[in-house]
Amino acid sequence: RICYNHQSTTPATTKSCGENSCYKKTWSDHRGTIIERGCGCPKVKRGVHLHCCQSDKCNN
């Protein structure tokens, strides 16, 4: 699986992953809205929006 693994507004980067899914996490703090992307489908804390998907580059 090829997943995006950049954060928020940094230039897009991808990673070849062993997992079959990609994720995109979104949350807000004093810096504003933070977006994190990566491989797999992690558990998240309350208040964090999580989107998991199972195709290449699906987590942009």
Swiss-Prot record:
Its main location: secreted. PROSITE patterns: SNAKE_TOXIN. Disulfide bonds join C3-C22, C17-C39, C41-C52, C53-C58. Transmembrane segments: none annotated. The keyword Disulfide bond applies. It comes from Dendroaspis viridis (Western green mamba). It is found in: Secreted. This is Short neurotoxin 1. Belongs to the three-finger toxin family. Short-chain subfamily. Type I alpha-neurotoxin sub-subfamily. Expressed by the venom gland.
